[in-house]
Amino acid sequence: LQQVDQLDGAHVWIGGRRMVMFSSYSYLGLLKHPKVQERAREALDRFGTGTHGVRILAGTTAAHVQCEQRIASFLGTEDAIAYSSGYVANLSTISTLLGRHDVVMTDKLSHASIIDGCLLSNAEFQRFKHNDLDDLKRLLEAAADKFEGKLVIVDAVYSMDGDVCPLPELVALCHEYGAWL
């Protein structure tokens, strides 16, 4: 494993060299932001170094609830939920939204968390060629009257190669076939 000697926003120091970190969660540099560090110290003093269990049993703190309320207020929604990682967010959200009467279609290069969420959902699981709108259209046409719900899932930016999805075209295609995106 590569040892990181120092974090600096989207950069790291490894072996005395400053490098761009393409796999960082802190691509906006917020891990070193003074306000974020101040609030983290406050949480450390109040709650210690971690929760006392998983959130569903005994791990939800006042900080979790306040964060979710602020997110919901910012978005103008009834509620929000914060997850500990993107992987868990994808896994639980996808598997909750879909069931055995639905179909989910995802790009062949989708992140593993998307694939796992799709498999856990019990929905019909289909994959289309990478960023290939014609292949997706073929799947959507075939699914037109066969399923209660249709969900198309893509990465906005594919983490393994940096490709960007054709979002405006995907929105139009999903709208045309009555699929969620």
Question: Residue spans of the language-model regions?
Answer:
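Short, small-residue-enriched loops and turns at beta-alpha junctions
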Residues: 29-30, 57-60, 112, 133-134, ...
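N-terminal "arm"/small-domain region of PLP-dependent enzymes with the aminotransferase-like
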Residues: 1-49, 179
